[in-house]
Amino acid sequence: MEFLSKYTACLSNWGLNLEPGLQTVGAAVLLTTGTLFIASRVLTFVRVLLSLFVLPGKPLRSFGPKGSWAVVTGASDGLGKEFSLQLARAGFNIVLVSRTASKLTTLAEEITTKHSVQTKTLAMDYAANNDADYEELKAIVDGLDVAVLINNVGKSHDIPTPFALTPEDEMTDIVTINCLGTLRTTQLIIPGMMQRKRGLVLTMGSFGGLLPTPLLATYSGSKAFLQQWSTSLGSELEPYGITVELVQAYLITSAMSKVRRTSATIPDPRAFVKAVLSKIGRNGGSPGYAYSSSPYWSHGLMAWFLTCVMQPMGKLVVGQNKSMHEAIRKRALRKAEREKGKKST
């Protein structure tokens, strides 16, 4: 009743002299709408917590039997290497695809030494977009029961750089590797999955695809493209029993991120990949994004806050993101100047 009295007083102050019955109806509608809005936010957050901390993901063996294969791109370092090792530990044979043949050979030997699985390797430079490389990849996977595809290959800017100053070769490589390379590889692999009515297509995304990222504009745009493409692909392939998932990730210690120290929000590849593979099919902190997930606990909470509480496309968030990357650029340029000075002495 106190709420109704205050509501009626507000209407009077605004010069809206409604009939008492209409005032009561209006107050009830306003109260109900507010309650439903708050309840929906609370329920969404509970769903996020359950997804991140309680509910298990789909078991990896649901995508293929023992002896089936996983294809991992960008496999020789960082996340790609860790995906390869953990999938081999789970019993999958591994096709390793990356640029450096020597690293692939070393990783293949490590995998076969530690685990009773087979490996195949392909040294392939995705930036070259060479038809012969894709034909060789097709020849390797033809006849294999490929149950899992990990689209991990990717490239970012060397340092945060305004778009107008971005070198053309860097811009071209980012789009060719992140977008075209992922699309061409996926198109080679999924026909077999569609025929077998099972499989997993997992693509590495980024918070850069959620939040417009000034000074990383080309990279951010490439990851936003993958977000839309992967979601569309997920809807197309779901009737075939294929799980498609884009992983939304914040920073991870890696050569690409240039971050070396772990923290609560920056895991190492081993912890991150373990979270990803244990939460397949769970949205984590991305309940508003179909066929997507933020499975690592701190990344999930950050994604929920950014997408459900903040406005990721708003000027405030974009401006803060810009300021952060401007500061990173200044530090990187100062470091480059110091190293240049050391070499000249």
UniProtKB/Swiss-Prot annotation:
One of its GO terms (cellular component) is endoplasmic reticulum membrane. The active site is at Y219 (proton donor), K223 (lowers pka of active site tyr). PROSITE patterns: ADH_SHORT. One of its GO terms (molecular function) is very-long-chain 3-oxoacyl-CoA reductase activity. Its EC number is 1.1.1.330. Pfam families: adh_short. InterPro entries: 3_ketoreductase_fungal, NAD(P)-bd_dom_sf, Sc_DH/Rdtase_CS, SDR_fam. It is an enzyme of class 1 (oxidoreductase). Keywords: Endoplasmic reticulum, Fatty acid biosynthesis, Fatty acid metabolism, Lipid biosynthesis, Lipid metabolism, Membrane, NADP, Oxidoreductase, Transmembrane, Transmembrane helix. It is found in: Endoplasmic reticulum membrane. NADP(+) binds at V71, D125, D133, N152, Y219, K223, I252, S254. Pathway: Lipid metabolism; fatty acid biosynthesis. The chain crosses the membrane at residues 26-46. Component of the microsomal membrane bound fatty acid elongation system, which produces the 26-carbon very long-chain fatty acids (VLCFA) from palmitate. Catalyzes the reduction of the 3-ketoacyl-CoA intermediate that is formed in each cycle of fatty acid elongation. VLCFAs serve as precursors for ceramide and sphingolipids. Belongs to the short-chain dehydrogenases/reductases (SDR) family. This is Very-long-chain 3-oxoacyl-CoA reductase. It comes from Aspergillus fumigatus (strain ATCC MYA-4609 / CBS 101355 / FGSC A1100 / Af293) (Neosartorya fumigata).
